[in-house]
Amino acid sequence: FHRTSLAVGRENTVVATCDVEIAEYVESIGGRAVLTSSDHERATNRVAEAVNVLEADGGGCVDIVAMVQGDEPLVGPESLRRVVECMSDPDVQIANLVYPTSNPEEIVDPNNVKVVIDRLKNALYFSRAAIPASMNSSNVFSALIQTGVFAFRREALLLFNELEESNLEKI
């Protein structure tokens, strides 16, 4: 909450959580929280529910939604601002903060989601496995690691929320 507030302002920061204790804490320090269902499989589902709740409560129509997953408490305000600034291009529907690494431990760690992008920086593929992979295991390569910080246009978030889980996600 604190770091996000530094990036986009307290008035533009809302915590979406299924945990009453977290919601109460956020509200005790003057923040806004939306209690959501505990049944969500993806963080984007929780955020989409929160957007719908905010709009139904008279909060107006949300245009851009920045999402910082709860396991990313150390993301700096400047990083979040960079992701949100991507949305100044009307053609951008989703922005995903990634960082490059050549550290083999980070690359093979299944807790790190890796992403392959095309020349226009569109995400092609996400994996917990080491991607891209080299046919020659002795080659040193780099990868892009997803941080858990995203920005969505409202419509893109709600559309993404409606998509069925893909076969790749089920693996």
Annotate each PLM feature.
Residues 1-12, 24-29:
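A short, N-terminal amphipathic alpha-helix
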Residues 164-171:
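Donor nucleotide-sugar recognition loop
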Residues 13-15, 65, 95, 123:
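Hydrophobic/aromatic residues located in beta-strands of well-ordered beta-sheets
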Residues 20-68, 74-82:
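Short phosphate-binding loop-to-helix
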Residues 10, 59-62, 89-93:
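Short, high-confidence coil segments that cap the C-terminus of an alpha-helix
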Residues 76-163:
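Conserved core of the sugar-phosphate nucleotidyltransferase
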Residues 17-18, 70, 75, 152, ...:
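A conserved hydrophobic position in a structured secondary element of the catalytic/binding core
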